[in-house]
A protein has these predicted regions:
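TRNA-binding/sensing appendages of the translation machinery
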Residues: 2-24
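Catalytic cores of enzyme domains
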Residues: 5, 22-51, 55-168
Length: 168
């Protein structure tokens, strides 16, 4: 657990992270996957089938559930805009690998915005993009709640965005 806390503290060294609010070590058993999340992507999001990090190209909830079985620990990242969780998660993933978490993999928030139009064949920005939690069937709202976070601030109605780094 000390290594995970050291990793979380590395976030403070990142540049341009004004949107970062908090991060905490969590157990992967608290991460919820559900079929309805993917269904919502398909029918309620205009980015469906437009990038390789969105459905139907991203892993589904069944595949994500299997992936989660390979991990015990994770870091959940809370931010105030949709771009920050992805950026922070990818940077943490790279640092984690150097800290002997060789299975580290990250997930961001929202759809990829690195290309004007995705070629839908082979990602040209794979080193700086990952699928979002929701694109992979993670119920972000319930996962956040399970770990003491709310998706929306009840007082001022601020919407929060989350990223995730799986560690092993």
């Amino acid at each position: 657990m000390d290594k995970i806390l050291k990793l979380i503290n590395k976030i403070k060294e990142f540049e341009d992270i004004d949107e970062f609010i908090d991060a905490k070590a969590i157990k992967t058993s608290s991460i919820v996957t559900a079929f309805w999340v993917r269904f919502k992507c398909k029918y309620a999001c205009g980015n469906y089938n437009t990038t390789l990090d969105c459905p139907p190209y991203s892993p589904g909830p069944e595949e994500m559930s299997e992936l989660l079985k390979c991990y015990d620990d994770a870091i959940l990242i809370k931010c105030s805009n949709h771009e920050a969780p992805s950026k922070i998660a990818i940077n943490l993933e790279k640092i984690a690998i150097g800290m002997e978490f060789y299975k580290a993999i990250s997930f961001g928030a929202g759809s990829c915005k690195h290309c004007v139009k995705c070629n839908l064949k082979s990602c040209i920005n794979r080193s700086i993009t990952r699928p979002s939690m929701e694109a992979c069937g993670i119920d972000v709202v319930q996962t956040a709640k399970n770990n003491g976070y709310n998706m929306v601030d009840k007082k001022d109605k601020t919407l929060y965005f989350f990223g995730l780094v799986l560690l092993k």
